[in-house]
Amino acid sequence: MSKRGSLQDRASPSEETVKKAQKRRKPIKSCAFCRKRKLRCDQQKPMCSTCKTRGRSGCLYTEKFTHKIETKELFGSTPNIELLKRIEDLEKRLDDKELTEKDVALSTSPFRNPYANFYYLQCKGSGRRIVYGPTSLRTHLSNDDNRFVNTYNQLWSKVKIERNRWKARHKWTMKPETQLLEGPPLEKTGSDILQQVCNVLPSFEQSSKIITDFFNTELETNEVSEVLDKTKIINDFTSSFLPSDELLPNGERRIEKLLPSTKKNYYKIGVILMILCIRHFYKNTPEEIEKFLIMLTGLSTAKVYFIERAQFLLLKYYHRELIWACGDDSHMISLVDLLCSTAIMLGLHLNIREIYKNQENIVGSMESLENLWVWIILSDFNVSLNIGRCLAINSSYFQVDECENGERLPKNTNNYSSTVFFDQSNSCMGKLKRFLRLARPMLDQIYDRSAFPDLAENCKKLRNFVETEFHPISYYTDSELISKVPLCEIKVLAQVLNLLLTFYSLRYLIYKEKSVVLENNILQTILVSFSLVINTTILCFNLDEKHFPEFFDHNCVHLPPFMALSLVYTNFLFPRASTGFCAFLYHKLTLFEKGYYLSSNIKDQEVTDWDLSTLNIPLDKAMNLLTAFKIHSDIFAKWSNDNNKQLRIIMARSYTFVINIALESIYRAVLEKVIKYRTEVENTWLQQLQDELNGSYSLTDNVNTPIDPSLSDLGVTSASPLAGNSPGLPPEEVRNNSENASHNNETGPIETELAQTISNEFWTAYNLGWEELMSQPDYKYLFDTQ
């Protein structure tokens, strides 16, 4: 059989054969797809049955083409090059048409990505506007139950009064840069900015000791030093920070002059100043230094692309995390954008060991550069997740995303630094690299309009990652065992939990998914997160007492190093967990439609048996909401009990800790009011109805039935009606949710009427109680840190 592209002359060499009458060729009626693949075609139009069964978008028949090809031309003695090119061109057009139709079908599909357009525009009265995307906590809160959002906003508006008093008392600001514009000018000394910086620096000997201690790897508070080369930094210090010849009374020398290296590389000075800010000045950076750092950050010519610029920007980002951690990274957006663009221009996304080969004396060790790239990827991931925007360093610069099934890039594909992330070591850095390799594609999918992210599968992968990469969860939720875990492991685990809660929330809010598994997992992950945050704070407090006792002097205003580090690790997790917990319980506790009643008693055994040693919850595990609230209260009691009074005093030095305490107090007040008024109204009406019925209609079973996400109860309460309102939900998923809600979906008329009566009474009592709370003159009890 002759192949396409090598047609042969089939004419017989004999004269008799040529003279024979040739058979008339039948017109081609099969579609192009069937003819090309030699399949049987029933020639139906517009689409044959073969193409239908194969899921094609349409058939193409040859009569659509008017180009006439003579028999002689088709069956010549030599291949027709022009004809072959024409065939190849038509086949390419066919393939392109198929791809275009597939893309159009995908873009108009009711199952397209539902997350990409999920956002919230924050509008301030001052005119400031910020768009928060699908993974932002602000977006989730703004799209939650209106009753809860209104309740939260009312109480928070009152607490803001006390917050502003605290800020005035402690002279706290989140805007140190703009403060320089508003404050009085620096004294005119006739000196340049570098000389002004010299005047506020510690002595040469003290600065040298601070820098040396910064590279002490025995203390985990120095973790960020791994992005720098110690030998290079010390050399930069001695060559750029010149001491005076005169001795101070204590025998030390002041720094007399700052000397930039060749080509005006001021970033070497900037890196060393940031080390001093992190380990010496803390939140009280002198205005002279702040002004110089702002200038370095704002330089925007091509003359600034030194490795030290990327290191400087990363250290500035880290310093902000230590001092001005605000939960959603909104103050990090511009800084991280600069950091990421600088990294790309420096080629850190390429094979670092290849492009910077034999340049160690200028840029530092290869290991420090690779660590710098990992930290930049992490900072980009944090801002993207917490703000809700696309990654600044997209997959084109992060080729790990191109690997399928976790397979390592081939050895000949060695142009990118992606191989850095295939670290199989059991170190904290190895765990962090593997997490970023797993999580970045998940985050990318959220913004890919042509994708349909499988968040349930992503959650499963994240839970498996926790099981395979970390100590058992009990090591993090037990206040004694957590001391056996490296602090940097807590950093990575908190990242996993934060992403896990984000995906759970998206499933709950957008798809209104109310399955037993999801709601159990939400509660369990939140409680594990609470326990992790509280235990980490107390652990770091104890480490500070041991290593930094000078910070416990009552005249000290700075947060001790380990406690500051605990904020870096958990400040983004706490707001998401606490807000999610309160919103979830508020919604469940104010559901009355199906006639379920809140149990007024919590058995001590239920609290004792609650298993916080795993993230995987059995399907048949009934999770009582009141028990969950009791466990939540017990966890946070570690912050407020008398044994930890000193802890609260130290926490009061940090704006972030103070806000966290206030948030927890707000949420607890809201939930306590809901539980109180619902329990009172239920008990009154159920007792009254029981007396009237004289036992003719028994509600005994239902009286003690708590609202909880059990297999029989939770599906009935909310899954069915809400799932029906989700046009973007795939049919199979809708069907599964409906099946969960189908059984036990019957209530008697008396119970239905009673549920409505209890609902009306509850909201009346709740609204009156809420007015009393809002009319109180003093809200210090919600903002108390002592």
From Swiss-Prot:
Example of a GO MF term: zinc ion binding
GO (cellular component) term, any one: cytoplasm
Region called Disordered, residue ranges: 1-25, 721-747
Leader peptide range in chain numbering: none
Domain of life: Eukaryota
Note: Present with 125 molecules/cell in log phase SD medium.
PANTHER family from the UniProt entry: TRANSCRIPTION FACTOR PDR8-RELATED (PTHR31405:SF8)
Stated name of the protein: Zinc finger transcription factor YRM1
Organism: Saccharomyces cerevisiae (strain ATCC 204508 / S288c) (Baker's yeast)
